[in-house]
Regions:
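Glycine-rich phosphate-binding P-loop
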Residues: 1-5
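ATP-dependent small-molecule kinase phosphotransfer cores
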Residues: 19-79
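Small-molecule kinase domains that catalyze NTP-dependent phosphoryl transfer to phosphate-bearing small molecules
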Residues: 32, 40-47, 120-165
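Short, amphipathic alpha-helical "lid/cap" segments that border enzyme active or binding sites
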Residues: 68, 164-169
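RNA pseudouridine synthases
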Residues: 74-80, 87-94
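Conserved nucleotide-binding/hydrolysis micro-motifs of P-loop NTPases
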Residues: 87-89, 104-108, 161-163
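Conserved phosphate-donor/acceptor-positioning beta-strand/loop module used by diverse small-molecule
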Residues: 93-115, 121-130
């Protein structure tokens, strides 16, 4: 995402949305980072026990609503690249949005994590599995759709077949 934004000279938003969500919700950036995209309390067992706002919403709902507002505002400001945070779903009704999902095989994804974050192969595989699972749970909760399913995107690319640079070029 970031490489594409640089290539096209567009604004790029990913984890920097966390700061904006923290400002809007008055929650700490650390808390938002831990909960925001993954919303761990969205399982049926714990959902009844988590904190609620005065309006009856969970804290995770509050975070999602703030992310939604921010993503919509960013899209209104102009062309940009937004990674994750259900942005594809949030912006689905806009005619000026291209939703892209890039996936790859486990080995290459693990290698990328190892190179970027200095993890061992085992650590990379565990991190990848955990992150993907959390994203899928959160995406399903927020959208009632399955994360990574091609029908939810205008374009899906396999970086293991096409290569990272080719995905950027496309």
């Amino acid at each position: 995402g970031e490489a594409l934004a640089k290539k096209l000279n567009l604004a790029f938003y990913d984890k920097n949305i966390i700061e904006q969500v923290a400002q809007e919700t008055k929650l700490s950036e650390k808390y938002i980072a831990e909960r925001g995209e993954y919303a761990l309390s969205h399982n049926r067992f714990s959902y009844g026990f988590i904190g609620r706002t005065m309006q009856g919403n969970s804290v995770d709902d509050l975070i999602y609503q703030a992310q939604k507002n921010i993503i919509c505002d960013l899209a209104e400001k102009g062309n940009c690249v937004i990674v994750g945070r259900c942005a594809d779903y949030i912006l689905r009704n806009r005619s000026d949005v291209l939703n892209v999902f890039i996936h790859g095989n486990k080995a290459e994804k693990a290698q990328r994590i190892m190179n970027l974050y200095g993890k061992t192969e085992q650590e990379a595989l565990v991190l990848m599995k955990d992150t993907d699972k959390k994203r899928a749970v959160n995406y399903a909760y927020c959208t009632d759709q399955k994360w990574g399913v091609s029908k939810n995107y205008a374009l899906c690319m396999n970086s293991s077949i096409l290569g990272y640079e080719t995905c950027i070029e496309i």
